[in-house]
Design a protein with these regions (language model features):
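Short, hydrophobic/aromatic-rich segments at coil-to-beta transitions
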Residues: 19, 28-33
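N-proximal short alpha-helices
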Residues: 25-28, 83
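A boundary/linker detector
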Residues: 1-20, 24, 123
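Rieske [2Fe-2S] iron-sulfur-binding domain
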Residues: 32-123
Length: 123
């Protein structure tokens, strides 16, 4: 398992508080889970290559908290999740929608601390 932070959002954050949101064993490879945050929900993904990614769970097109239920894959060499409702693809590392580049999801820094999966939250 790659225990390094898997995205660059941490580089732009002023100060993060790392919050344990689940155990690694709670996320099967190739799937996602939804986690509740103080201000909403995050979609946490574990790829088949054991990389961790975290995005906002709120789908801006269907207006439902369903991104964590999307299918993981790749398009044009980019790792993506397909929304389960209208099938838009969001890049796991940037949150950008491939079908509408004016739309993006918040990306959360994520890391593995032992067997705890942690999100970096600015609070």
């Amino acid at each position: 398992m790659n225990s390094a932070v898997s995205n660059t959002a941490v580089n732009n954050a002023m100060e993060l508080k790392w919050r344990s949101v689940c155990r690694l064993q709670d996320i099967l490879p190739g799937t996602g889970v939804g986690v509740r945050l103080a201000t909403g929900q995050a979609a946490l993904f574990r790829t088949r290559e054991d990389e961790l990614f975290a995005l906002d769970n709120h789908d801006p097109f269907s207006r439902a908290n369903v991104i964590s239920r999307g299918l993981l894959g790749s398009l044009g060499g980019r790792k993506v999740v397909a929304s389960p409702i209208y099938k838009q693809h969001f890049c796991l590392d940037s949150g950008k929608c491939l079908e509408d580049e004016g739309v993006s999801l918040t990306v959360y820094p994520v890391r593995l601390n032992g067997q705890d999966v942690e999100l970096g939250l600015s609070e």
